[in-house]
Swiss-Prot record:
NCBIfam families: PRK13685.1. Residues 98-294 form the VWFA domain. It is found in: Cell membrane. It comes from Mycobacterium sp. (strain KMS). GO terms for cellular component: plasma membrane. This is UPF0353 protein Mkms_2500. PANTHER family: LEUCINE ZIPPER PROTEIN 4 (PTHR22550:SF5), SPORE GERMINATION PROTEIN (PTHR22550). SMART domains: VWA. It is a multi-pass membrane protein. The chain crosses the membrane at residues 18-38, 67-87, 309-329. Belongs to the UPF0353 family. Keywords: Cell membrane, Membrane, Transmembrane, Transmembrane helix.
Length: 335
């Protein structure tokens, strides 16, 4: 949590938990203070003339004279927590991840069940996604129908990606597996270039499609979509699928109306096999919401951040109050 004026505070994920051993010292000091205070009170009761004492100091604030010591102990506890180094989850923009946007450009994308058409809506939302993706992400673009083509290799140049999106052209057949395999190859290539240390950069495939794979006819074939999804899982690349369209879509082929209903189930299985996530959208507005969700997932990562500042400031504040209370109540520091 974050408190006004104090900053982030957390009581978990301590980087230096051994600092809590200092609480033994704090407890010992508190115990010593109590022992000294009780002994002092006994001496006063034994030797003091109570009638004279009451006449000299009848309104002495006995109940409050321990407040400075209490505040001092509290401040030491708070400062100990700060020194132990609590942490909290912090979302920061990624700066070396790879995202491959894989878009289906088969003839079914001509369907107008989504205005103005499935492809036109996909182009508009995909360009917005490219604009809003965090700048450090390397974004690539693949278009696929019967075959897959890398239109833009992963790059931080968003204008190149948006220009290529505008130029997408429809083609025959749907080879979803080819699109996924091509994306994996592009990720491996760029990973060898921008990878830092011994591990490749984190990567993800965003697969945008409206229908069932037609080439090959069996998605479990070596070049099929399900085989590609399993390969993606083995390579640690989850696939986020977006099934776009309605059950009522159709296209005109040779002056005949051909139904092209969206196939949510196949895309969901691709996502499940790759340990990714499946999304559905049946309008441009829903598609924008899906892309916004993905942007938050892909563009940021959660790391451990410092959460000791709030404890440090609160401890310093209580320590200052202890000193002030000592001056006002006893005209001296507690002890």
């Amino acid at each position: 949590m974050t408190l006004p004026l104090l900053g982030p505070m957390s009581f978990s994920g301590f980087e230096h938990p051994w600092f809590f051993l200092f609480l033994i010292v704090v407890l010992a000091l508190a115990g010593l203070y109590v022992i000294v205070a009780l002994a002092r009170q006994r001496r006063i009761l034994r030797f003091a003339n109570m009638e004279l004492l009451e006449s000299v100091a009848p309104n002495r604030p006995n109940r409050w004279r321990h407040l400075p010591a209490i505040l001092l102990v509290a401040s030491l506890v708070l400062l100990t927590v700060a020194m132990a180094g609590p942490t909290r989850d912090v979302r920061v923009p990624r700066n070396r991840a790879v995202v491959m946007l894989v878009i289906d450009v088969s003839q079914s994308m001509r369907a107008t069940d989504v205005s103005p058409s499935r492809l036109a809506a996909a182009q508009e939302a995909s360009k917005q996604f490219a604009d809003e993706l965090t700048p450090g992400i390397n974004l690539g673009l693949i278009a696929y129908a019967g075959t897959a083509t890398v239109l833009v290799s992963p790059t931080t140049n968003r204008e190149a990606t948006k220009t290529a999106i505008d130029k997408l052209q429809l083609a025959d057949r749907t080879a979803t597996g080819e699109g996924i395999f091509t994306a994996l190859q592009a990720i491996a290539t760029v990973g060898a270039v921008i990878g830092g240390g011994d591990e490749p950069p984190p990567a993800r495939i965003v697969l945008f499609s409206d229908g069932k794979e037609t080439v090959p006819s069996n998605p479990d074939n070596p070049k099929g979509a399900f085989t590609a999804a399993r390969t993606a899982k083995d390579q640690g690349v989850p696939i986020s699928t977006i099934s776009f369209g309605t059950p009522y879509g159709y296209v005109e082929i040779n002056e005949q109306r051909q139904p092209v209903p969206v196939d949510d189930q196949m895309l969901k299985k691709i996502a499940d096999l790759s340990e990714g996530e499946a999304f559905t959208a049946s309008s441009l507005e829903q598609l924008r919401e899906v892309y916004a969700n993905l942007q938050q997932q892909i563009g940021y990562e959660t790391i451990k951040g410092d959460a000791s500042v709030g404890w440090l400031r609160l401890g310093a504040l209580v320590l200052a109050l202890s000193a002030l209370a000592a001056l006002l109540l006893n005209r001296r520091l507690p002890g």
